[in-house]
Swiss-Prot record:
Modified residues (Phosphoserine): S62
InterPro entries in the cross-refs: Ankyrin_rpt, Ankyrin_rpt-contain_sf
Motif (Nuclear export signal (NES)): 282-292
Gene that specifies this protein: Ankrd54
Source species of the chain: Mus musculus
Tissue occurrence: Expressed in a variety of hemopoietic cell lines and tissue with high levels in testis. Highly expressed in ciliated cells.
GO molecular function: protein kinase regulator activity; protein-containing complex binding
Protein name: Ankyrin repeat domain-containing protein 54
Length: 299
């Protein structure tokens, strides 16, 4: 019995097993660095195939190579990840989300701006523009505050809107610009203001009418009318001259513009109805001649 017990002790000391006849290899303790297990060292030991019975070193390195690569990564992968994210993307992520459209309060202010322009409410239009309302904001039919003001002939509101950045060439749902609407409603001062504000000088509407056509129509009405007072006729002729001056200046016709300057000076010196009618006739002749020249240029 003693011999048997001694044999067992010898087997345990030598590390041999009585069951399989092979050597039992004790696993190596994992190295520790600062209280943390170094998986990189463990991966290296596995990759080398040390301590694995019945497996060659080359075969072990081939089969466990992917584990070694994984375990040899940095201890703090979050820092590496953070470095790969572009700085601009981090700033955008930290920035609060921008609103995709106007708020309900802003929508109400924009509608109020268009309604006020349509109602000729100059004070409200001015206040809303000073508060930051967008003068180019349109309704569901594409109409802006400038469209309404131009159609109504309110030159003061038109000038306010232009001063705050309104687009004189913005089209509504039907393709009409503010200049189209001012021409259709025969508002000569508004046409002059829009031309000064950058409105295009090509055809006013789809019929191809220009300020020259409008001026001729207005002058024909003045020549046929006999009931208007002197000051009313003089004011209307003056407005037509200013419109044509601005229009011809935009076209680069400086000689014709000088002719209009002479007519304007002559109009200011009139004191009787006959003198005003004479200037009106001269202006009508000038307009007809300009229309003929314009027609010949298009051919």
């Amino acid at each position: 019995m003693a011999a048997t017990g001694g044999g067992a002790d010898d087997e345990s000391r030598s590390g041999r097993s009585s069951s399989d006849g092979e050597c039992a290899v004790a696993p190596e303790p994992l190295a520790e660095a600062g209280g943390l297990v170094s998986f990189a060292d463990f991966g290296v030991s596995l990759g080398s195939g040390a301590g694995l019975p019945g497996r060659s070193v080359g075969r072990a390195q081939s089969s466990l190579r992917y584990l070694q690569v994984l375990w040899q990564q940095d201890v703090e992968p979050r820092d590496e990840l953070r470095c790969k994210i572009p700085a601009g993307r981090l700033r955008r992520a930290a920035r609060p989300h921008r609103r995709l459209g106007p708020t309900g309060k802003e929508v109400h202010a924009l509608k109020r701006l268009r309604d006020s322009a349509n109602a000729n409410d100059v004070e409200t239009v001015q206040q809303l523009l000073e508060d930051g309302a967008d003068p180019c904001a349109a309704d569901d039919k594409g109409r802006t505050a400038l469209h309404f003001a131009s159609c109504n002939g309110n030159d003061q509101i038109v000038q306010l809107l232009l001063d705050h950045g309104a687009d004189p060439n913005q089209q509504d749902g039907l393709g009409n610009t503010p200049l189209h609407l001012a021409a259709c409603t025969n508002h000569v001062p508004v046409i002059t203001t829009l031309l000064r504000g950058g409105a295009r000088v090509d055809a006013l509407d789809r019929a191809g009418r220009t300020p020259l056509h409008l001026a001729k129509s207005k002058l024909n009405i003045l020549q046929e009318g006999h009931s208007q007072c002197l000051e009313a006729v003089r004011l209307e002729v003056k407005q037509i001259i200013h419109m044509l001056r601005e229009y011809l200046e935009r076209l680069g016709r400086h000689e014709q513009r000088e002719r209009l300057d002479d007519l304007c000076t002559r109009l200011q010196m009139t004191s009787t109805k006959e003198q005003v009618d004479e200037v009106t006739d001269l202006l009508a002749s000038f307009t007809s001649l300009s229309l003929q020249m314009q027609s010949m240029e298009k051919r």
